[in-house]
A protein has these predicted regions:
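Acidic, PIN/NYN-like endoribonuclease modules and their adjacent C-terminal/linker elements
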Residues: 36, 107-147
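Active-site neighborhoods of divalent-metal-dependent phosphate/nucleic-acid chemistry enzymes
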Residues: 67-102, 107, 138, 143
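Residues that scaffold the ATP/ADP-binding catalytic core of kinase and kinase-like folds
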Residues: 12-14, 46, 112, 129-130
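PIN-domain endoribonuclease scaffold, especially VapC-family toxins
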Residues: 24-81
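Hydrophobic/aromatic ligand-binding patch that stacks against planar heteroaromatic rings
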Residues: 63, 93, 112
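Short, well-structured N-terminal submotif of metal-dependent ribonuclease cores
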Residues: 1-35
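Glycine-rich, phosphate-binding/catalytic loops in enzymes
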Residues: 20-23, 52, 119-121
Length: 147
């Protein structure tokens, strides 16, 4: 599955243990991660200023994301009204790249639910969908991913 992880999901994964870290590991292990330069720039700032993560850890995490993801940049902004204009560029990048799911904790984006072919899910919704799909796949003799 083509997945775009929003800044808040990546920041939580890098700075804390828990669901977002599990989501990031699963996406790295079994899916195709898409990311934009905007998200990487936001992530650097959030990790440094909000979470007070060391510069070495920030550099390592950004390097990992750059190495193991597909670049996604916006072509045209969708005709959607959002308070945060930066979120429009993130949605546009995901749509332009043909991403299936945008995983975010941003309530305004989550309220949209879907834009074009892009489904917008919370980390919990995404995780539950993955686990449901894995159970179905395991029942048909398909490999079950575990991370």
């Amino acid at each position: 599955m083509k997945v775009f992880l929003d800044t808040n999901v990546l920041a939580s994964a890098a700075a804390t243990r828990g669901l977002c870290a599990d989501v990031v590991r699963e996406v790295f292990g079994s899916h195709e991660l898409f990311i934009s330069e905007q998200v990487l720039a936001e992530l650097r700032g959030v990790l440094r200023l909000k979470f007070r993560v060391s510069q070495d850890l920030i550099d390592d995490f950004i390097w990992l994301l750059e190495e193991d993801s597909v670049p996604a940049e916006p072509a045209r902004l969708p005709k959607v009204k959002l308070k945060d204009r930066d979120d429009l560029a993130i949605v546009a990048a995901a749509i332009t790249a043909g991403v299936e799911v945008l995983v975010t904790g941003d309530k305004e984006l989550l309220d949209l639910g879907r834009i074009a072919n892009l489904e917008i899910l919370s980390p919990r919704q995404f995780w539950e969908r993955l686990k449901t799909q894995q159970k179905r796949g395991a029942g048909r003799g398909e490999p079950r991913h575990s991370r």
